[in-house]
Amino acid sequence: ADGISFICEVKKASPSKGLIAPDFPYVEIAKEYEAAGASAISVLTEPFYFKGSNQFLMDIKNEVNIPLLRKDFTVDEYMIYEAKVIGASAVLLICAILDDEQLASYLRLAHKLGMSALVEAHDEDEVRRAIACGAGIIGVNNRDLRTFTVDIMNSVRLRKLIPDTVPATHMGTEVPVPSVPQKMVYVSESGIKTKEDIDRLKANGTDAVLIGETFMRSPDKKKLFAELRGE
């Protein structure tokens, strides 16, 4: 699927699925993703539910050149500074767990530190909040965090609410308004398993897909990557 970017995830476990990868050569997995053509790598560093570690991200940073998203649920400013220190290029801000003031100030802080933020939404209200806080990268999670059910059409339905460029008025006081409008990046997350899923999302104007478990469970990640891209 030419024209859609892949954010590939390195994760050992998750709250909904438990242990995903008992054998976890995370640096090798990250290098495999990069070699396959991933645009970015998502890394879970949260120790309890995702069995992650800051060390994972630091070690991967030393071995790959593509951007790293720290996929932990950001809940305070400290975590944003920490993400910068360990080598992340982007942090995750989830609308469901942050209020509007937090979303806007955390986004500004990330930008000030030279990082991006993936602002995650799950429904219409959250998408509107993500746009209002000045998000330049909006991710729609196809998994309902309350019930864990997955519906890929969630991304398809919500795409129509997303403007093609980031509204300049919301850029925040510390960030200068760019003279050229910044393109909005729309990401679909969770439950993406087949080329058909990707074709459907691509046809609907999705810029990137974030794929975790599907890749983590695959014995040949490079082959799967090629299949999903339709190569």
Question: Which residues does each predicted region cover?
Answer:
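N-terminal active-site wall of soluble small-molecule enzyme domains
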Residues: I4-S5, V10, K17-L118, E124-R129, ...
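Catalytic cores of alpha/beta
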Residues: V75-I86, H122-C133, I192-I211
